[in-house]
Amino acid sequence: MIAISADESPESSSPALRLRWLFLLLLLVLIYGSHAPLLSLCKTQAQIPFSASSCVLLIETSKLFISFASLLASGSVSTLRISISMTTASPYAVPAVLYAFNNHLVVFMQAYMDPSSFQVLSNLKIASTALLYTSCLGKRLHRRQWFAMGLLVSAGVSHSCFSYDLEGKRETAVYITSWGLLLVLVYCFVSGLAAVYTERVLKSQRLPLSMQNLFLYTFGVVVNLASHLSGGEQKGFFEGYSAVVWVIVAGQVANGLLMSVVMKHGTGITRLFVISSAMLVNAVLSWGILGVQLTGYFLFPVVLIGWAVYLYYT
């Protein structure tokens, strides 16, 4: 794990720490970007061969055990005995519920819109996160930084619409109902709220990050275990697991733990840049591994994201 002191911020620290921070962000971009291509690789007859709920539960449980091991290794167990209370731990239940709600909402809303419409409109979560970041955390963005957020939204929309050569491959008509539009707006709001709330909780409590993760993932395991048991899953817990699936699990475990570092020591806006950059990695890996054809317009979102990074951080 990349160690960053609780009293240091990446922007105002030594060159060595900035280099570690950059490495962490690049690693996150790679993990995020490789997730969808890896899922495609493990599909059989266009279907995911394993239980999605068991996979999520396994990921949450792994993050919980790693957080506990990290807490033991840091020698902060005595702090844990002092810090355990409902007042301290209960705020971490909110992100678990919000993320679980959104995971189910994504599946539910597919009946009210086509996948392409969802992919395009889900980029509005960038705007919702930025708005909640300024209103709930009291942070102020300059005009050029707001413009950078607009560039990220534009990059996501243009990438979804124009980067892939889908001629002759579109199987469903483009449509969205008024109910579907409302649901996708709720999805974007909840996504932003979960990110901003998590950042606020992590930064407001002066506790070791491993301890905060322990609280966070305990609730994550409880919520996802309840979801798995109530879902009537027909497949065995590890049925359909291949080497690629285990790579996905390991990647998502690392992704969650590293993203908590970003939320603790960076900002939710940094998370948005990671996710936006990851869609470009996703496209390149899909082209290289899956043979997906890219159009010349792929360079347009690349330029927009690069411009957004320059405007926001300079």
Curated annotation (Swiss-Prot):
Lipid bilayer topology: Multi-pass membrane protein
One cellular component term from this protein's GO annotations in UniProt: Golgi membrane
GO MF terms, alphabetically ordered: pyrimidine nucleotide-sugar transmembrane transporter activity; transmembrane transporter activity
A single GO BP: transmembrane transport
Subcellular location: Golgi apparatus membrane
Topological domains annotated Lumenal: 42-54, 110-145, 197-206, 264-267
Record carries keyword Metal-binding: no
Signal sequence extent: none
Annotated Pfam families: Nuc_sug_transp
Catalytic reactions of this protein: CDP-L-ribitol(in) + CDP(out) = CDP-L-ribitol(out) + CDP(in)
Keywords from the named record: Golgi apparatus, Membrane, Sugar transport, Transmembrane, Transmembrane helix, Transport
Entry's family note: Belongs to the nucleotide-sugar transporter family. SLC35A subfamily.
Record's function text: Mediates the transport of CDP-ribitol. Does not exhibit CMP-sialic acid, UDP-galactose and UDP-N-acetylglucosamine transport activity.
Protein name per its UniProtKB record: Probable UDP-sugar transporter protein SLC35A4
